[in-house]
Amino acid sequence: MTIDEGKLQILAAFCELAWADGRVTQAQADFISDLAIEMDVRLGSYLPVLVMGLSRPPRAKVENLADIPIDEVERFQLVERFVAMCLLHEGLSNEQADVLARLALQLGINARELEEMRRRLC
């Protein structure tokens, strides 16, 4: 997987996480949109991902985050961003917690590390 393909998978994972509790808030949509710009993804590449990902629930789960060519520090930073997005509104729903745990495990982050991130970001 190339780094550009990986960036699109990361955006898809954020969209899946946003939909975990059945709806995407404006704050989550803004968070993901800002992230796409920050990641320096070409507009023509990420716009279709965002339009599809934010307009309806994903058809398939993101299962290949481990294949993205990023180092350990970047993996931790990515999961911290997942957690930060989940905490934008009322808190972490059970559905979001399940998706978050699955995505974090793909990136080599265990439950203890994930809980430490959540506490640090609260």
Model regions and ranges:
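Small-residue-enriched hydrophobic alpha-helices in membranes
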Residues: 1-122
